[in-house]
Amino acid sequence: KEGMLVSSAAAGPAFEGGQLSCGTGSIPGAVRDVRIQYGLVRYETIGRKPPVGICGSGLVSAISEMRKSRMMDNTGRLSLRYASRGLEIIPGKIVITQADIREYQKARAAIRAGLEILVENAGYRMEEIEALELAGGFGSQLDIAKAAGAGLIPEKLAERVHILGNAVIAGLCVYIQSPDQEGIRRMIQHTREIFLANQPKFTKSFLDFSHF
């Protein structure tokens, strides 16, 4: 179909580290990947630098592993063993608390509800989507299998994800170098924004996706 639909979901603070107890942006030293095996926690930082906090991709990775290890239930509630102290990535320094998980659940619910509504407004079903493109620092660090495991993206789309990197800069370069800048401007003019707050189904979808 001609034109584009766009929307936005209020999920940035959780994935940018701003609302996390030990959060940080996707900078050198940020914990980007977490693995849990037999109760032991291992991690990897960006640039293999000394750990300074956990970024959005690290949170997604940790929650996927915590779900797999049955450290939380389908409501996101931590098991009794971890309820008070959370999951310690680095004891005494970097921890994922119950409050952090709740922040993730809100962000995840906003994204999944927004995606469902956007696809529905376009007249498609989720299984008909050919590609899911992720951009930015958060997307470039994300483990797609773990993003599906943490419920951030639909499992049926996991194999169709494309990582774009810094799409803003790439897009500007394309525009500057394009011989058809007017055509690009016309494409932008045919873009329609979907305001999620005005969508009757948003609240129900948000609540549905709040649980795993």
What residue ranges belong to the model's regions?
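Helical "lid/coupling" subdomains associated with nucleotide-phosphate turnover
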Residues: 1-212
